[in-house]
């Protein structure tokens, strides 16, 4: 299981997602360009010291990400225009969950490359969740389904 971030533009959300990945023990694919420098203090503040615990693979473009991707890994795009509710999808341990830009989601080429396009059901009138929250919900559900949730309690 991996988390892919498509051209993220808010460093605090990227930092929160890196921390999430560290806590769940999964790798992150960072598809550039980003809307910030990777040494941005806001990213570091949100990630704390967890970013050092994450296997981060940087890709200079969408094309480079596609070329480097494991061909056995399904690409699962989280989108407000998804056709399958998150909780009705059967995840596999090798899936890559892709989150789009906070400001614009992902372009049509990314939608076209997806093996599945999932949506998190929301109350009527609600447009979307913060990308870090959506990532946390999606990743938890995926790891729960495949039996890969960490077994330990948080350190005290």
Task: Go through the PLM ranges and name each one.
Residues 1-156:
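Post-transcriptional modification and biogenesis factors for structured RNAs
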């Amino acid at each position: 299981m991996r988390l892919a971030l498509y051209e993220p533009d808010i460093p605090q959300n990227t930092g929160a997602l890196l921390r999430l990945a560290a806590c769940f023990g999964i790798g992150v694919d960072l598809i550039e360009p980003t809307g910030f420098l990777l040494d941005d203090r806001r990213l570091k503040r949100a990630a704390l010291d967890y970013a050092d615990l994450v296997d981060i693979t940087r890709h200079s473009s969408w094309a480079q990400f596609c070329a480097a991707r494991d061909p056995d890994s399904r690409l699962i795009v989280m989108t407000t225009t998804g056709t399958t509710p998150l909780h009705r999808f059967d995840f596999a341990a090798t899936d890559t969950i892709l989150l789009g830009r906070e400001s614009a989601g992902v372009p049509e080429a990314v939608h076209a490359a997806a093996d599945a396009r999932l949506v998190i059901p929301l109350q009527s009138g609600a447009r979307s969740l913060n990308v870090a929250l959506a990532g946390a919900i999606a990743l938890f559900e995926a790891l729960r389904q495949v039996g890969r949730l960490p077994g330990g309690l948080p350190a005290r």
